[in-house]
Amino acid sequence: MTNRLELSGIICRTPLRKVSPSGIPHCQFVLEHRSVQEEAGFHRQAWCQMPVIISGHENQAITHSITVGSAVTVRGFISCHKAKNGLSKMVLHAEQIELIDSGD
């Protein structure tokens, strides 16, 4: 089964860095995406806020250079997580994060 997602946007919540009891580092943040997409010959506004998690030692270097307001492209897969309130939420498990140059 295919499960791939690539999403660009702005980090809108402060990245939360944790280390699991087994020693695996995790970084969680929320990515806000806004764009105009074409559907059935019409332009429509696309918007979402997607929780993102990136795990593992090899991926943590990039997480220390991202902050609220950073523009990034995230590639990975999606999965459901159960929130503390018992509701399910979709989460993007990042395998790759690229900073988008703002041109400043």
Swiss-Prot record:
Protein's UniProt keywords contain Transport: no
Record organism: Klebsiella pneumoniae subsp. pneumoniae (strain ATCC 700721 / MGH 78578)
SSB domain location: 1-101
Family affiliation: Belongs to the PriB family.
Subunit structure: Homodimer. Interacts with DnaT. Interacts with PriA. Component of the replication restart primosome. Primosome assembly occurs via a 'hand-off' mechanism. PriA binds to replication forks, subsequently PriB then DnaT bind; DnaT then displaces ssDNA to generate the helicase loading substrate.
Keywords, ordered alphabetically: DNA replication, DNA-binding, Primosome
Known role: Involved in the restart of stalled replication forks, which reloads the replicative helicase on sites far from the origin of replication; the PriA-PriB pathway is the major replication restart pathway. During primosome assembly it facilitates complex formation between PriA and DnaT on DNA; stabilizes PriA on DNA. Stimulates the DNA unwinding activity of PriA helicase. Binds single-stranded (ss)DNA at the primosome assembly site (PAS). One study finds it binds 15 nucleotide (nt) ssDNA. Another study finds the minimal ssDNA length for binding to PriB is 25 nt; prefers dT(30) over dA(30). Also binds 22 nt dsDNA.
Protein's UniProt name: Replication restart protein PriB
Single GO BP term: DNA replication
GO cellular component: replisome
GO MF annotation list: single-stranded DNA binding
